[in-house]
Amino acid sequence: MFLRNFFVFIVVLFHFFNCYSQEVKNDTVKVEGWQNSGKTTFLINQTAFSNWISGGENSVAATLSVDYNLNYYKNGWSWDTKMVGSFGVNKNSDSKFFKKIDDRIEVNSVMGKKFIDQFSFSSFLNFKTQFAKGFKYSTNEEGNETRIEKTRLFSPAYIQLGVGIYWKKNNSLWVNFAPVTGRLILASKKFTNDLNQGEEYFGIPRGQNSRFELGASISAFYKFDLVENVVLEQRVNLYSDYLYKADNVDLDYTLSAFMKINDYLSTTLVIQCLYDDNAIKKLQLREVFGLAFVIDILEIPRIL
């Protein structure tokens, strides 16, 4: 039942984007060879109170992110790579710890060979992990804040390899469907050796450092101008494991809105939704809003 619905969804999705491509004038001319683009964003938000009767906590948060794209096209062959790195922390006046609000390393690379119109046979690689240690925070009997390490660099790490069909309208709109996708989840035994019998760490059983899955995946990207000076970016990744609970689809969806003030300043909103029942059987939500300083990566040498 799930697989049938899964493939119906794919057909509807491709039909929608195909209709879109027919309705919108294609003003993108394919340039052969290499193209690159990217941006560096420094996002900050801050709250301060002094003798504020209603109460409140002083806080400051900052996030640095790099988003880089490398695209190649020649004789029907395409190779599109997106690399994202982001790290952010928050400090509240009532906490002795700096706490992460963002921590992400991700590389997504798709290679395709065109066979008709905007469709290509494809193979892809996706890698995801984080930069720094992640902690679970609590308060002990004395009322002091404590923390326990839960994650770190490469714990967990996700590697996906798959083959399928790649539909690409342009660099701002594409979908990749890979019905044959292998996924490897890696972690240090530091986090699995002390698990109780039957417990798992991101799906990895006690005493092990990896888990292999075989399933299907969908990844898509869409960037467009909502109104003048307001750009929206949507990224979605879906994965279903054929070997274990195929109806539990892992979701990673990110919506980014950039409201331009001038060439270097913008107001930025990021909303991310995650679901992975190997990690937690609940929908995870993250939202960040603030003032961002944005620099085009290609302009950095000129500025320096």
Model-predicted regions and their roles:
Residues 285-304:
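Outer-membrane beta-barrel "beta-signal"
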Residues 58-64, 101-105, 155-159, 210-216, ...:
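Residues that define the transmembrane beta-barrel architecture of outer-membrane proteins
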Residues 42-44, 64-72, 107-113, 127, ...:
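Residues on the lipid-exposed face of transmembrane beta-strands in outer-membrane beta-barrel proteins
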Residues 77-79, 118-121, 172-175, 229-232, ...:
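Repeated loop/turn-to-beta-strand initiation elements of outer-membrane beta-barrel proteins
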Residues 38-40, 81, 123-125, 163, ...:
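Membrane-embedded beta-strand positions of outer-membrane beta-barrel proteins
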